[in-house]
Amino acid sequence: MKYFNRLIDKELEKWMISEIHQPVLLRGARQTGKSSAVRNLAKKFDYFLEINFEEDKEARLIFEKSNLTPQLLCEKLYSNYDVPIIEGRTLLFFDEIQACTPAISSLRFFFEKMPDLHVIAAGSLLEFAMEEIPSFGVGRIRSLFMYPFSFTEFLEANGNIGLLSEIRKANFQAPLDIVVHNKALYLLKLFMLIGGMPAVVAKYFIDKDLHQCQQILDGLIVSLRDDFAKYKKRIPAVQISAAFDSVIRQIGNKFLYVDKEQVYSAYQIKNAVELLIMAGLIIPVTHTSANGLPLGAEINPKFRKLLLLDTGIFQRLLGLKLSDILLNENFDAINKGGIAEMFAGLELLKASSFYQQTQLFYWQREAKNARAEVDFVIQKNMEIVPIEVKSGKQGKMQSMYLFMKEKKSKMGIRTSLENFAVYDKIRITPLYAIGNEIV
């Protein structure tokens, strides 16, 4: 499959040439492109050894049946795979490393004993394995977090470099030309339909076949559900599946652990949801009082909304046929089930630092006869900024104004299908450019 460049490629290249390069742990949900990014980086090395611990029993035995130093481990790996492991010239890649706990533990010793060897590890269910390791190499291992394609990555891979440049330069004083704006909206609609899972994006760019994209999405959904059995043996897969279905039903709303279609207790669903979050399949948006920075200092973890990691998967879970929606000129056909809010949240997440697991926040007031909610709250230039998401080209903003008055905010952002504009203290940012607000 052809490789389409990702923003994380530049971070991996910086790591490759830096004087100090701790072993990298690529973290993220299954099928988000971690292995492909490493293989792309490997083209810059003289030698490349990839070991998949889920598939390679011999590799697991090497790590599980010996207490070897990194040097001796490399000798055994060389004799077994006939690939020279030379510091500065070889990239050593441990894939699906969650299947071999001793291999995870070995990463810290590679940095201590062989600091010039480039080592990357990745795993789709890595968080579960790391939870069971009492001491993990703090300061000796660098984590990078990876997600599906962002809209920026999608445009770049599609060759829309000029459009991307225009979007980056545009602001409320210099909005996009209407023709350019409409083109961006069409591509936004396409991206929200197929989503950012690399296999789907690649298939679309190669064949432009939405039917095949739909088939790949359906296959990914089956694969993701099959993974539920691997999460934690003490929680049945059927219970995790029920929690997952409950999340899908409640996208865009404060999540209720008990709903009318649910047969499990709130406690059972809560435990299952936590596993879905650990697997990276579900993204939490947590309530914050937003009285000051950091936003995470005043959270209420009992109140949160939950997003799915990909809009394309969500569209298929709703049973929507991609080709029919793309041909429908009414953009509202794609905005069912809170997908605009989901897209905005995912773009904010993807535009954040690769080096930390970014938290998303929202604000809500439950006062009697004065309920208000702001979809997202971000920190921008040491200011607290509220963001409201509108699926169309208009919408009231009472909650935004209430928040700004109560918190004395200097600025708010409304993101919608509108072009760049400003009204009083409310800046209008098109949905396709919302990720730029993090930069």
Predicted regions located by residue number:
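N-terminal pre-Walker A segment at the start of P-loop NTPase domains
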Residues: 1-17
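Conserved catalytic cores of phosphodiester-cleaving nucleases, focusing on short active-site segments
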Residues: 344, 348, 374-393, 412
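Short glycine-rich substrate-engagement loop in P-loop NTPases that contacts/grips substrate
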Residues: 55-87
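Accessory nucleic acid-recognition modules appended to NTPase machines
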Residues: 201-373, 378
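Structural recognition of the conserved hydrophobic beta-strand(s) that form the central parallel beta-sheet
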Residues: 118-124, 145
